[in-house]
Amino acid sequence: MISCVKKPICVLLVCFTMLSVMLTDPCATEVLAASDVTVNVSAEKQVIRGFGGMNHPAGIGDLTAAQRETAFGNGQNQLGFSILRIHVDENRNNWYREVETAKSAIKHGAIVFASPWNPPSDMVETFNRNGDTSAKRLKYDKYAAYAQHLNDFVTFMKNNGVNLYTISVQNEPDYAHEWTWWTPQEILRFMRENAGSINARVIAPESFQYLKDLSDPILNDPQALANMDILGTHLYGTQISHFPYPLFKQKGAGKDLWMTEVYYPNSDNNSADRWPEALDVSHHIHNSMVEGDFQAYVWWYIRRSYGPMKEDGTISKRGYNMAHFSKFVRPGYVRIDATKNPNANVYVSAYKGDNKVVIVAINKSSTGVNQNFVLQNGSASQVSRWITSSSSNLQPGTNLNVTGNHFWAHLPAQSVTTFVANR
């Protein structure tokens, strides 16, 4: 810690580096970042489809009208989610439950996609899986009927005002203790022989842990690959070292790569406001975008005691961490190259769209960081910013001036900041 008698030195440092008034204790230890953040506006990476979560009326009850506004609106005290995931119930008599929230999401400009847990019961058989005689799988002679079942859901939603952006073949076919198992070869067969008849974009295989043995066969089979539009996966327990997917880079041209379900770092009851634990959420999104090149990031239940929206309908600390991306990095924006780790425990990603450059900077250390940002192959005159810390939630900061294509900013200890530069 710096002695309070040295406070004038802190103030001078702020002045000389064009920093605004710090939101943390002015006597707290501050460091100068080890390196600049260089944002190369012309170095384009993946197109971002959006950020969002799951609504599951059959499981935990539907979102209320007010909660839909909080989830999909992009005003003050709203999350700005641009993706909604819904459930394909095996019983078509329950499909109506998905309509109202999906229509609200569409009204706000979000995209809606659907994932099934089970086929209709008459299409399922039990089998012996490693001693479990109650394990379920799709009957081999029902693959075409199952594709039609998915088509029927697409048609039902369309007739009720919801054009699904895409539909999945199966939720977590490799972790199906309570739903339907698929082996890699079964998924491959369906993708090759039946997925082409589905009247929507197709997501597969939605592994629970990004296990490549489920998706490699699809990528290596030209017909199956032609019938897959989006490679979707979940990231439960997936190590960051497994986020990159070289085979997808090699074979997946023209295909999207989505992270379609996760909660992180845990699902502890009433954990959504824990701090600084909630910073793990923005850090996980950062790694998904930068290390995994994912184009979508979808949370599990939108409303849950460990989710982005608490049971009372208010936004949690985890939700505000998501909002640092979802409110500012809008569908169609493109991730651009940026120095991803300019200082210990500082993580940066950058995006562009609508004549803006959006930078999300996470400081997980217990020390504030004075960071220089350099815009390369692009220019701006002023930068707006929003900060979430232990004591603030998406709090607007003072605007920062850009001089010679660079600006200085203070990253408070244990905080996330989103910067928006109008080009």
Predicted feature descriptions by range:
Residues 38-42, 75-219:
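Substrate-binding cleft and catalytic face of glycoside hydrolase catalytic domains
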Residues 19-30:
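C-terminal segment of classical bacterial N-terminal signal peptides
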Residues 398-423:
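C-terminal beta-strand-rich structural cap/linker in extracellular carbohydrate-active enzymes
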Residues 256-329, 336-344:
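Aromatic/acidic polysaccharide-binding cleft in carbohydrate-active enzymes
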Residues 180-284:
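Noncatalytic carbohydrate-binding groove/subsite architecture in carbohydrate-active enzymes
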Residues 341-381, 414:
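Carbohydrate-binding surface patches
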Residues 31-70:
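N-terminal module-boundary/linker segments of secreted carbohydrate-active enzymes
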Residues 47-55, 80-88, 111-116, 165-169, ...:
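Structural recognition of the beta-strand scaffold that forms the well-ordered cores
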